[in-house]
Amino acid sequence: VRNHVTCRINRGFCVPIRCPGRTRQIGTCFGPRIKCCRSW
């Protein structure tokens, strides 16, 4: 996952920090600083 569109398609969301709680990073959104997270 390398942008916010594919992040959304994969049921993820973008955060500028570490992925919260039980979510896991599945890629990035707008560069390496913004992470795409998804709950499992």
From Swiss-Prot:
Pfam families registered for this protein in UniProt: Defensin_beta
Expression sites (tissue/organ): Neutrophilic granules.
Keyword Disulfide bond: yes
Keywords from the UniProt entry: Antibiotic, Antimicrobial, Defensin, Disulfide bond, Secreted
Cellular component GO terms, alphabetical: extracellular space
Gene3D superfamilies associated with the record: Antimicrobial Peptide, Beta-defensin 2, Chain A (3.10.360.10)
Disulfide links within the chain: C7-C36, C14-C29, C19-C37
SMART domains the UniProt entry points to: DEFSN
Keyword Flavoprotein appears in the UniProt entry: no
Molecular-function annotations in GO: CCR6 chemokine receptor binding; chemoattractant activity
This protein's encoding gene: DEFB2
Lineage: Eukaryota, Metazoa, Chordata, Craniata, Vertebrata
Annotated family: Belongs to the beta-defensin family.
Function: Has bactericidal activity. Active against E.coli ML35 and S.aureus 502A.
Superkingdom classification of source: Eukaryota
Main localization, broad class: secreted
Subcellular location field: Secreted
A GO BP annotation: cell chemotaxis
Protein name: Beta-defensin 2
